Structures are given as C-alpha cells and as structure tokens.
Amino acid sequence: MEEVINGILIREVETKNIMTKSSLPVGGYSVNPYVGCTHACKYCYASFMKRFTGHKGEWGTFLDVKHWPEIKNPKKYAGQRVVIGSVTDGYNPQEEQFRNTRKLLEQLIGSDADILICTKSDLVVRDIDLLKNLGRVTVSWSINTLDENFKNDMDSASSIERRITAMKQVYDAGIRTVCFVSPVFPGITDFEAIFERVKDQCDLFWLENLNLRGGFKKTIMDYIAEKYPDLVPLYDEIYNKHNRSYFEALEVKAEAMAKKYDCPFVDNEMPYGRVPQGHPVIVDYFYHEEIRGTENTGKRNR
C-alpha cells in the first residue's frame, strides 16, 4: 500500500527479519524499523540506501514502514549490542502514527541486549516507560551545533533545544545518554560550547568528523561556498587535498578538554554504565572508517 501523508510518500513493506548483523565499529546488530528518513539531513551517509528501494523521489521524501514477524526469542540477543537507527531514525515524525519503534522495544523486553538508540528527535521521551524496563539501554542524540539556523539548513528534525530537553528527561529517568557531536563541521561546529550545555545530562560525549563522499559532497561544498565563503579554503584543504591537520588539532583540543573537566578520554570505546554527573566519557570517533575491531572495542589503525 502506498499513500502520501503530509507530503511524504508512505509505503508499507514486509520484511522477513528485522534484526541484521552490523558491520559498524560498535558491532552487534542493526535494527531499522523504517527504510528512508524524513529528517532529510543534507549530509546523510545513509542516503545511498535509496538505490535499493525503487523510490524515484529524493532521500527524505519517502518512508517505507516495515512489518516483520514478532521476535519470539529475544534472549537470543543477550549480551549483544543492538543499534536501533543505523540508517534511519526510529523516531522520525511518522513514528508517532505507526509506532514501529515502540513495537520493537516491546519485543526486546527481557532480551538482556545492550540497546543503543540513535536519534535526532524528542519523541523518544514517549517511550521512557519501556526504556526503564529494558535494562542496558543507551539513547544518543546527534547535536553538532547550537545554531538553530544552521541546523535548519541541514535537517528538518527536532530543534536543538528540544533534543537537549529530551536528553535531560531521559538522563533524569536513570537512562544512559549520549551527546553525539556528529558530524563536526570544520569552522562551524563548536564542540566545547555544546559540551558546556550537555555535560551534566550525558554519560558519553562522542566526536565524529564530517565525512564527505558520494552525492552529498557537492551539496555540502556548494552550501559552504554560499553561506560560509571564508571557509572554502579550509574545506578544499580537508576534502579535496585530504589534509588531516584540522581534525588532528581537534583531537588534541578534545583531549585537553577532557583533562580540564576530569573526563575519561577514549578512542572508539563505549564502556557501559553511568558516570559522575558533569564528567562524561569523551569519545574520539574521528575517521571512524579506519576503525575495525571485535567485541565492540575496535582500535584505530595507526
């Protein structure tokens, strides 16, 4: 069945298995209750998924709502990391109607899986009741700016303020939270300012560089030329000449920030547990495509 709802083409599809083995450095399983994402982020690495869908519209203009057989043996995933939203956002606006992510969480209760939810939405607070019953669960919000105008240029997801408010609600409910500063836009993202806003309501503070490839490289480079012309030489140096010195300097800056605030500083690790308030683990995830590992503790190839 297909229909257009609020300008988005909605298609309901059947899938044999909602759980997919993950190739991400964080490992485990990837679970995506939808195909497509209506947040329509201009830098979305998952936009490559369009070619597998048969959709002709642009990424962000369609959403496939998955139907899957009920997970009958959730204990099968005990001890495994389960990432919800690796190539979609399980809390896109349409989740309010279709409730696929809530259904998935209900089926995972009692699994003893290490669940990681990745989102840019505040809708996740609706499911705090389920999250508290899931045991090892982490909710991660992508926040790469405090400038709502820049955010609106890049995506149509919840405002930054709504994300920060949702993070505090989930954190105060006793659920582990992550501020995922991703992607870090050179010359635009001020991760120290973001850290100041969220350090008392997150357990991990992840940093990931902007990685330009595929069709969206031109989109972003054209945007920088139009809105931030003074940054064109920097972006040319990083993304055309492949100079890493900018992000190498940011790594040094991040480590210094960790020392200043007495925070652990790690390289692509996701240790479980709550941390003393105001001292989140700062995670260096720059150039993560070089990271390969087992048991979710991949190390960078240096």
Stretches found by the model and what they are:
Residues 156, 168-189, 240-244:
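Conserved strand-turn element in the central/C-terminal portion of the radical SAM core barrel
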Residues 133-139, 199-204:
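Glycine-enriched alpha-helix->loop->beta-strand junction motifs that scaffold or abut catalytic
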Residues 109, 171-172, 199, 259:
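Anion (oxyanion) recognition and catalysis
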Residues 29, 82, 115, 139-141, ...:
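Hydrophobic faces of well-ordered beta-strands that scaffold small-molecule active sites
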Residues 83-92, 122-125, 137-157, 186, ...:
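Conserved radical SAM core fold
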Residues 120, 142, 266-270:
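Conserved beta-strand termini and adjacent loop/short-helix elements that scaffold enzyme active sites
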